[in-house]
């Protein structure tokens, strides 16, 4: 099942990042696109952690793939907020954050998985790492939403009308 699920994830992510992300972000705007992507990831991770049957994970893969729109939406907003002379520094900082997360993430989530299945844990809960990931993603969504505040999203169809009225 692992090989099949990874193949499905790869296909779904290619579809989302290869074509749907731009369309969804274009329709919703960057801020709402980021929120949708992070919310989809939160729901999928919580679902993976709570799914009592393997087939349920397959059903959640589509929801999880929608999380792939968060990155492009965030990247677009961040890129627009800095001048051309700062783009390299910003992209370098984003890559550094991604690298640190790529190192720390597996250590944290492997440890949390071990806690969930460990002999000394009460009741054994192998989905603990996924619930933890859902919680961290939800926290990130709340923080991002607050940080964006009144972000002027040029892709948001309602933004132009609101800014004229103000």
Locate the predicted segments by residue:
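Intracellular juxtamembrane helix-capping segments at the cytosolic ends
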Residues: 69-83
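Structural signature of the two symmetry-related core transmembrane helices
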Residues: 32-47
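Multi-pass alpha-helical transporter architecture, strongest
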Residues: 131-166
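Loop-to-transmembrane helix entry
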Residues: 1-14, 125-127
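Loop-to-transmembrane helix entry/capping segments in MFS-fold secondary transporters
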Residues: 82-96, 123
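Helix-to-loop junctions at the C-terminal end of transmembrane segments
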Residues: 15-30
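Helix-loop junctions at membrane interfaces in 12-TM secondary transporters
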Residues: 47-61, 70
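A membrane-interface helix-boundary motif in multi-pass transporters
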Residues: 111-137
């Amino acid at each position: 099942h692992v090989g099949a699920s990874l193949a499905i994830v790869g296909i779904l992510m290619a579809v989302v990042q290869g074509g749907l992300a731009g369309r969804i972000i274009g329709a919703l705007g960057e801020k709402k696109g980021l929120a949708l992507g992070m919310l989809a990831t939160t729901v999928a991770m919580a679902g993976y952690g709570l799914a009592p049957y393997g087939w349920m994970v397959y059903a959640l893969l589509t929801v999880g793939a929608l999380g792939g729109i968060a990155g492009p939406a965030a990247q677009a907003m961040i890129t627009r907020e800095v001048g051309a002379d700062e783009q390299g520094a910003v992209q370098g900082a984003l890559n550094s954050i991604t690298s640190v997360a790529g190192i720390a993430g597996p250590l944290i989530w492997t440890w949390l998985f071990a806690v969930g299945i460990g002999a000394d844990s009460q009741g054994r809960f192998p989905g603990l790492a996924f619930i933890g990931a859902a919680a961290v993603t939800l926290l990130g969504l709340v923080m991002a939403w607050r940080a964006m505040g009144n972000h002027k999203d040029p892709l948001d169809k309602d933004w132009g009308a609101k800014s004229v009225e103000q």
